[in-house]
Design a protein with these regions (language model features):
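DG-centered beta-turn motif at the end of beta-strands
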Residues: 2, 30-32, 52, 70-73, ...
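Extracytoplasmic/secreted cell-surface and envelope-processing proteins
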Residues: 36-38, 79-81, 139-142, 167-170, ...
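VWA/integrin I-like adhesion module and closely mimicked acidic/polar interface patches used
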Residues: 103-107, 129, 136-202
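Short, hinge-like loop/turn segments at secondary-structure boundaries
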Residues: 86-89, 175-178, 225-228
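Juxtamembrane amphipathic/hinge helix adjacent to a transmembrane helix
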Residues: 206, 210-243
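C-terminal signal-anchor/stop-transfer transmembrane helix together with its immediate cytosolic
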Residues: 1-17, 228-283
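Membrane-embedded segments
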Residues: 8-127
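Extracytoplasmic/secreted proteins, especially bacterial periplasmic and envelope-associated proteins
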Residues: 51-58, 89-92, 108-111, 115, ...
């Protein structure tokens, strides 16, 4: 019985759909090998991917009643999390992202933007935005063209550029072990800032440098320009606690047990807890 009480049994779980006002945001995160490189000029600095995840977590925390989805891409693009109002799940999926998720290397930014466009709801009134976070290197398709298509649909594309113009080597495991080309030279991966800026301009978005302390606030301010519309959100109500019923049953059983034990215990019986003493007038 004690075990049951400690387990805190519950029943009657309910869910209900409520209306909130917000926008829809799809995040497209570059997971190509170049994102393992340092986000700064220091080869041993925080990787571009690690810094990207920190930035995106802060952005998700600012979304309020909005919805968010997550796409990862390298040579191909994949949906990691469909658009949702469950920010806890979004941050959980975000934390698990690595450069090993996409087998085909490359930076298919256009494919990621196109996938993001097709991931939004059919609600034409709600504001929609794509947050693209990449170093922009080795892009393989028409990323600017994809951004222009997004603009035609009223979708804002914001870009966060990771890395620096000077560039950094790509760690391959082990101290000082970096990726080398066919000639044995260390590969230096650089931020393609010009292309990142062109993508943002093509779709009414803003470009921010990932190393900027204002990166999160700049993106957040641009998102606030979008029209908020009624969005459905599923709210799970709290379960009804059932353990008090078992607690009362346990209490009654304990009291009954004490009385029974006292009556049967020879040592206790001499104290006459349950026997009324009758005075003998002849003594």
């Amino acid at each position: 019985m004690v075990v049951i009480i400690l387990a805190r049994p519950r029943a009657g779980a309910k869910s209900e759909t409520t209306k909130v006002r917000g926008i829809e945001v799809m995040i497209a995160l570059d997971v190509s090998n170049s994102m393992r490189a340092s986000s700064t000029d220091d080869p041993n600095g925080v990787s571009r991917l690690q810094r990207s995840k920190l930035i995106l977590e802060k952005l998700i925390n600012k979304l309020g009643d909005d919805k968010v989805g997550l796409i990862v891409f390298a040579g191909n693009a994949y949906t990691q999390l469909p658009i949702t109002s469950d920010f806890m799940s979004a941050k959980m999926f975000l934390s698990s992202i690595s450069t090993n998720m996409v087998p085909t290397q490359g930076t298919a930014i256009g494919a990621a933007v196109n996938m993001a466009m097709n991931s939004f709801s059919q609600n034409e009134k709600s504001g929609k935005a794509i947050i693209l976070i990449t170093d922009g290197e080795n892009h393989e398709d028409d990323a600017v063209g994809a951004a222009k298509e997004a603009a035609k649909k009223g979708i804002q594309v914001n870009v966060i550029g990771m890395g620096t113009g000077k560039g950094s080597p790509i760690p391959m495991g082990g101290q000082g072990n970096f990726l080398k080309d066919d000639n044995g030279q260390v590969v230096i991966t650089k931020l393609n800032e010009d292309m990142a800026i062109d993508i943002a301009k093509a779709a009414g978005g803003v470009y921010v440098a990932g190393n900027s302390t204002d990166a999160v606030n700049d993106i957040d301010e641009n998102l606030k320009k979008l029209a908020k519309e009624d969005l459905e959100r599923i709210v799970y109500t709290q379960h009804d606690e059932q353990f008090p019923v078992f607690a009362w049953i346990a209490l009654v059983l304990m009291i009954v047990n004490v009385f029974v034990v006292e009556r049967k215990n020879k040592w206790l019986s001499k104290y006459n807890f349950f026997t009324k003493t009758v005075k003998d007038d002849n003594k």
